[in-house]
């Protein structure tokens, strides 16, 4: 089993437990160059809010700082944006789905920024 399969196995177990809770899910996906966050409905079929480093406003803001989307500063910015968008959609509380990634570095920065911006999980 390679590391990608291991990550997906961990993600599957987390998603099963979150589905039992019947709450909105904040899912995070990261690549070497970008980070993505989406808030899914409790049934898991509809995306209620999303933010990523591919958005034009985010890219413009990151160009002023470091010019890249694959760092902790970018993850912090995405965490704030996803919290604002979720609150605008009427979502106050979510379950955090780290998609099998370790809670460290960019994933941790995104989660902490979302919490500071008022999202509860």
Swiss-Prot record:
Family per similarity comment: Belongs to the universal ribosomal protein uL18 family.
GO biological process, one term: translation
Protein name listed in UniProt: Large ribosomal subunit protein uL18
PANTHER family: 39S RIBOSOMAL PROTEIN L18, MITOCHONDRIAL (PTHR12899), LARGE RIBOSOMAL SUBUNIT PROTEIN UL18M (PTHR12899:SF3)
One Gene Ontology cellular component annotation held by this UniProt entry: cytosolic large ribosomal subunit
Subunit structure: Part of the 50S ribosomal subunit; part of the 5S rRNA/L5/L18/L25 subcomplex. Contacts the 5S and 23S rRNAs.
Keywords: Ribonucleoprotein, Ribosomal protein, RNA-binding, rRNA-binding
Highest classification ranks of the organism: Bacteria, Pseudomonadati, Pseudomonadota, Betaproteobacteria, Burkholderiales
UniProt keyword annotation of Glycoprotein present: no
Spans traversing the lipid bilayer: none
Gene of this entry: rplR
GO molecular function annotation: 5S rRNA binding; structural constituent of ribosome
Described function: This is one of the proteins that bind and probably mediate the attachment of the 5S RNA into the large ribosomal subunit, where it forms part of the central protuberance.
